[in-house]
Amino acid sequence: MPEKLDSSIVLLRERIEQGMRGSADLILDEFELAGVKGLAFMFDGLVSNTQVSDFLLRPINRIDPPEADPEKLWEYLRSQFLFSSEQGIVETYEDLFTKAMSGFAMVMLDGVPRALSLGYQGFETRGVGEPAMEKNLRGSREGFTESNNTNTAMVRRRLKSPNLTVETLYLGRQSRTNVRLCYLSDVAAPETVEAVRQKLREASLPLVLDSGFLQAFIGKGAASLFSGTGTTQRPDTLCAKLAEGRVGVMVDGSPNVMIAPYLFTEHFHTLDDYTQRPYFTAFVRLLRMAAFFLTVLLPGYYVAVVTFHPERIPRMLLPAFLGSVSATPLSAMGEALALFLLYELLREAGLRLPDAIGHTLSVVGGIVIGDAIVTAGLVGLPMIIIIALTAVSAFAVPSLYEPVTILRFLFIFIGGILGLYGMVLGFLVLVVNLCSLHTLGTPLTAPIAPWQPRTLRDLFWRSGWQRLGQEDYNVSSARQRERGQTDDQDT
């Protein structure tokens, strides 16, 4: 049970000072109104000094209260004298500290076991800019920032519907992070919203600094390569998902908004698909899907063929392929693993360094090291070509980079040990695993499994807006269809 606020200003001040342990940024200002002592509690750097001075300290010094009773005086301050766009009443110490650390000024009077919270936030935030990871050719250039207030406003500006609901939770035992749930109450399934809300409340974490901290609690855990949740840094993308019955999860301090549930096929869709011509959209989507299978299977297939099935190599390429393998000290599997580990090492180093140095390291390191190992005869040219083609294909679907990287290594091992038969078996296991995954009751592979023919108009290709706009798609239909199939089987 949360501890209630004391009515004594002396006890309140002692409790605050004890809880903050003499923090240098703690501000405690005492004042007196009609013989009643008061206390203002805030943190330097989190509140706007101008707003605190103009709307709190100066008005309190000029006030001539008609009543000396603490309860009536507190109500007078709350309703007629102290104003803020974000004003609330706090009754527990937990909420008192949480509000103060979120940029609120807290006002308390002796004899009143409540505090008035005034939203005078003044901390610095990053301005709205274009997302770095989700570039588009047409449409908005706005991206989410680290402020939940700004992010909510960008969504509200695009979805001018009274059904757009925003709920606030405070998660993290130490961080008490402001987490917001966004959904359309007339579109999202109530059981989906309740499931997300419950899973977030059950998330027992000391810190919540990004939406990635919460993904494992809503989607699949670490044991699964694929997650049933997605992320976006674009408000227009989030609005499109909310209109399909999804739930958005915003974490204060992070520009990455989580979307749940998220289907596997959506990784191959972008916002530009809906602004381009349908025939070009179909071409690009099929290209992304081909790139996914290419980056996962091509290295393992090459290793399996040159190791166990050289008869499948075209006759004109046979001398080059087998000659490169026999001329190098490593096996085909060893070559592939060594080169991919080197590639991941260069990529990781380039990501962690400043942009100018990171780009130079990636380009120069790749060229110099690649040329050196080929000249030294450590690897063959065919393997270099396979690695380059695979790496480029991986960037066509950036949201799947993590599972793709692990799957690529797994298929290299399978191809190098079991050959093509092992590759086929491994691919079947991958498909079965994908079809068995669910998030919030929605199959990850919907609308392919379970099969929903009417959604094909926006799956591998996109129909024109004349047809696409005739019926709204709702992600809960996949769950309802699967339930119907299960009921039929039980019957």
Feature roles, as predicted:
Residues Y301, E311-T491:
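Generic detector of multi-pass transmembrane helix bundles and their immediately adjacent loops
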